[in-house]
Amino acid sequence: MAKSKTPAKRARRAEANRLRNKAYKSKLKTAIKNYENAIIAEDLDTASNKLLQVTSLLDRSITKGILHKNNVARKKSALSKKLNSISQ
């Protein structure tokens, strides 16, 4: 553990940020799973609504600094392709 005040505070902040990011990523993964379940059920209306929710969460993760913008772009593209595959 850190001996002086500044590194100790940084360690506390890093842990708090880690837990916050972990919770947000868990929320995001749950939303993606719900979307994929709607895709499997081939429910187009539900899937399109879930895609909007997932896209919103992904975009917010960029702003919060949780995910990189290229990572988010790749995820959004893959999820959109899944929706397009059942809509045809």
Swiss-Prot record:
GO terms for molecular function: small ribosomal subunit rRNA binding; structural constituent of ribosome. It holds the Pfam family Ribosomal_S20p. InterPro entries: Ribosomal_bS20, Ribosomal_bS20_sf. GO terms for cellular component: cytosol; small ribosomal subunit. Keywords: Ribonucleoprotein, Ribosomal protein, RNA-binding, rRNA-binding. One of its GO terms (biological process) is translation. NCBIfam families: S20. Belongs to the bacterial ribosomal protein bS20 family. Binds directly to 16S ribosomal RNA. This is Small ribosomal subunit protein bS20. It comes from Syntrophomonas wolfei subsp. wolfei (strain DSM 2245B / Goettingen). The gene is rpsT.
